[in-house]
């Protein structure tokens, strides 16, 4: 299938040529310019909330790099009124999320959050952001239930697993032609949620299921179940560290079963964990745009800044940060004003035109299939 992408996106540089910094009416506070209601839009912070260390650190670093690129571009255009990126390293751990969220809330100069990156930590942190009126735009948390909590500060720039799950099932059925599928999840908010949707979408084609745990090392019981099930393909809902070990152990056991995984596995760390030979042929679904198809000069700008190609969710991280930067550029200097601005946002980003519904979901959604080929993760096709 020939990939179809519809983008009407201006140059990244033009998108970041925001309104110059200036004062607005209102009272000052003793602490200086803050997001709580100051007279100026200078000295504000945008927080990144996600894993920068731990087993899923690569995905968080990808997002932070995208957000930083957007902020650096803004600061170049507004040198006398810069915005700071503040990082909150959750390690992807829901248990750490509440304290970190409260830390961000308590810093009144924080005007918005890019993240949380993962669904489990989002479930733990977003109620705190909502209570404080602090906007949180996730570039990567895909559990559908996150949008069903009435959080007026919750937004995401990509489709959720209610679109990714059926798309993965469609690929398994229509492209791989699998009639027998085993579904495995890692018991996480994200992994189990996505796997359950895939399972429901596949219906009678599911011949067996299994649940593993994050940080698990020995997957031999699951490999045995895969063999005995007669599955032609396996869908795994979880992250790249466990997926890589699972695929390695499948290969070591002589299984040729095709492994299909979700966006949490779309990282080179998967190939490292599985080994190049074992990883070959893996199918990865993601509600994310291939980085080289991002609009404007994003791809070239990212490579210049980091001497590397954009990775999973780097472009989405850029877009999430840019929405908040546009609010600042428009003179929105209170948290309440930023939330209102984001709720009515309707502008081109580098991944799509960004517009949100009443629940914070994006108006444009696409899901892509990627494959591991020659030791690299490459686009296969948009699943339509």
Give the positions of each predicted feature:
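Extracellular/periplasmic periplasmic-binding protein-like sensory domains
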Residues: 247-318, 376-380
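Segments of small-molecule ligand-sensing domains
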Residues: 306-314, 325-376
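Bacterial signal peptide processing site
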Residues: 22-25
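Extracellular/periplasmic Venus flytrap/periplasmic-binding protein
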Residues: 99, 144-145, 152-254, 289-297
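Beta-alpha junction/loop-to-helix N-cap segments that form part of ligand/metal-binding clefts
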Residues: 28-29, 33-34, 61-63, 73-148, ...
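Periplasmic-binding protein-like
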Residues: 48, 104-117, 137-139, 180-185, ...
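Extracytoplasmic "Venus flytrap"
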Residues: 36-68, 86-95, 117-119, 184-192, ...
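C-terminal motif of bacterial Sec signal peptides marking the signal peptidase cleavage site
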Residues: 17-20
């Amino acid at each position: 299938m020939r990939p179809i992408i519809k983008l009407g996106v201006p140059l990244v540089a033009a998108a970041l040529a925001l309104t110059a910094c200036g004062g607005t009416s209102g009272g000052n506070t003793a602490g200086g310019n803050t997001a709580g209601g100051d007279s100026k839009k200078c000295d504000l912070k945008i927080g990144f909330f996600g894993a920068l260390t731990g087993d899923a650190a690569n995905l968080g670093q990808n997002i932070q790099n995208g957000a930083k690129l957007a902020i650096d571009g803004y600061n170049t255009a507004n040198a006398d009124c810069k915005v700071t990126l503040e990082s909150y390293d959750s390690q992807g751990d829901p248990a750490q999320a509440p304290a970190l969220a409260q830390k961000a809330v308590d810093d009144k100069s924080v005007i918005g959050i890019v993240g949380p990156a993962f669904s489990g930590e989002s479930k733990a942190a977003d109620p705190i952001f909502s209570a404080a009126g602090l906007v949180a735009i996730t570039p990567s948390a895909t559990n559908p239930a996150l949008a069903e909590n009435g959080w007026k500060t919750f937004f995401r720039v990509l489709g959720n697993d209610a679109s990714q799950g059926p798309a993965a099932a469609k690929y398994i059925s229509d492209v791989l032609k699998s009639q027998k599928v085993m579904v495995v999840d890692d018991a996480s908010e994200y992994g189990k949620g996505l796997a359950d949707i895939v399972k429901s979408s596949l219906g009678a084609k599911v011949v067996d299921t299994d649940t593993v745990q994050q940080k698990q090392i020995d997957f031999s019981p699951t490999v045995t179940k895969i063999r005995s099930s007669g599955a032609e393909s396996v869908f795994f809902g979880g992250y790249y560290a466990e997926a890589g070990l699972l695929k390695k152990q499948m290969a070591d056991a002589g299984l040729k079963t095709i492994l299909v995984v979700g966006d949490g596995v779309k990282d080179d760390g998967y190939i490292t964990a599985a080994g190049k030979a074992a990883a070959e042929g893996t199918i990865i679904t993601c509600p994310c745009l291939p980085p080289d198809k991002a609009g404007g000069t994003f791809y070239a700008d990212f490579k210049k800044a980091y001497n590397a190609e954009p990775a999973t969710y780097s472009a989405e991280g850029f877009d999430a940060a840019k929405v908040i930067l546009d609010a600042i550029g428009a003179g929105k200097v209170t948290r309440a004003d930023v939330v209102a601005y984001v709720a009515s946002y309707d502008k081109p980003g580098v991944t799509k035109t960004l517009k949100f519904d009443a629940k914070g979901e994006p108006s444009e959604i696409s899901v892509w299939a990627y494959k591991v080929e020659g030791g690299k993760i490459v686009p296969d096709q948009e699943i339509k």
